């Protein structure tokens, strides 16, 4: 039994994960709020610190290593990228936060863009808050979680690069303590883009968003 199976109450991945057998494609990039599209499809977003492995994880669950551009240089996702999966789901890659080596004005522009999207998207069903397993939860991760709760956004915690650590107990304890301070409960998952551990369970959790009701507030 994997760690992820324990976290999600030992439920097996459902056939809904077959959704990710379809080919996802890049459909839009938004560098400012006026460029944010409305596809009238459920959206799932990925957010995390620069170099946390967002693009690699998106490529892993979509079985396409060239879908989202991967770079070892933090801060290379400078816009919101939208990927269409079988006209059933939109995967949203948000700019990384934290130590990106970009001018302050650019960072502020990204913050405005991300905040606007999180506040106004009526199609957003779930946000995946990515945390580097080697680093643990940092102060800026906490601020993002608070922003999500402020905007009444459902989210789950995804520990990335799990192949680089030997034990998840400390991470699990850290996550549960963190969630307790937020008075929030959610899935906590462990995923490796390299070994593919946890990818199947993650796909299943994302596919469920297709039937999840939309928020009343619209974009």
Swiss-Prot record:
Q: Which domain of life is it from?
A: Bacteria
Could you say which residues bind GTP here?
Answer: 48-55, 75-79, 93-96, 160-163, 191-193
Entry-linked InterPro entries: G_ENGB_dom (IPR030393), GTP-bd (IPR006073), GTP-bd_ribosome_bio_YsxC (IPR019987), P-loop_NTPase (IPR027417)
Pfam families according to UniProt: MMR_HSR1
**What are the EngB-type G domain coordinates in residue numbering?**
40-212
One Gene Ontology molecular-function label: GTP binding
Q: Which Gene3D superfamilies match?
A: P-loop containing nucleotide triphosphate hydrolases
**A biological process from GO:** division septum assembly
Q: Which UniProt keywords apply?
A: Cell cycle, Cell division, GTP-binding, Magnesium, Metal-binding, Nucleotide-binding, Septation
SUPFAM superfamilies, alphabetized: P-loop containing nucleoside triphosphate hydrolases (SSF52540)
- The answer to whether UniProt assigns keyword Nucleotide-binding to this entry is yes
Specify whether Transmembrane helix is a keyword of the entry: no
Annotated residues that bind Mg(2+) are located at 55, 77
Q: Cofactors per UniProt?
A: Mg(2+)
Q: Which HAMAP family match?
A: GTPase_EngB
Instruction: Supply the NCBIfam families for this chain.
Output: GTPase_YsxC
Query: Per the similarity annotation, which family is this?
Result: Belongs to the TRAFAC class TrmE-Era-EngA-EngB-Septin-like GTPase superfamily. EngB GTPase family.
Report the protein's function.
Answer: Necessary for normal cell division and for the maintenance of normal septation.
Write down what this protein is called: Probable GTP-binding protein EngB
Q: Read off the lineage from the record.
A: Bacteria, Pseudomonadati, Pseudomonadota, Alphaproteobacteria, Rickettsiales
């Amino acid at each position: 039994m994997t760690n992820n199976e324990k976290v999600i109450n030992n439920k097996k991945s459902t056939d809904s994960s077959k959704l990710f057998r379809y080919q996802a494609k890049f459909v839009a990039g938004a560098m400012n709020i006026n460029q944010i599209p409305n596809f009238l499809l459920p959206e799932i977003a990925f957010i995390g610190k620069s170099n946390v492995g967002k693009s690699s994880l998106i490529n892993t669950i979509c079985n396409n290593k060239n879908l989202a551009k991967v770079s070892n240089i933090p801060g290379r996702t400078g816009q919101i990228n939208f990927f269409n999966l079988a006209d059933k789901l939109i995967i949203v890659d948000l700019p990384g936060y934290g130590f990106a080596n970009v001018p302050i004005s650019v960072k502020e522009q990204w913050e405005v863009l991300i905040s606007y999207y999180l506040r106004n998207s009526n199609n957003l069903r779930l946000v995946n808050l990515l945390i580097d397993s080697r680093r643990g939860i940092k102060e800026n991760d906490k601020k993002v979680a608070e922003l999500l709760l402020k905007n009444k956004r459902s989210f789950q915690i995804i520990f990335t690069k799990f192949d680089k650590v030997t034990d998840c107990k400390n991470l699990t304890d850290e996550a549960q303590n963190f969630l307790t301070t937020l008075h929030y409960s959610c899935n906590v998952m462990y995923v490796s883009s390299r070994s593919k551990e946890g990818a199947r369970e993650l796909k299943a959790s994302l596919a469920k968003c297709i039937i999840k009701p939309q928020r009343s507030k619209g974009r």
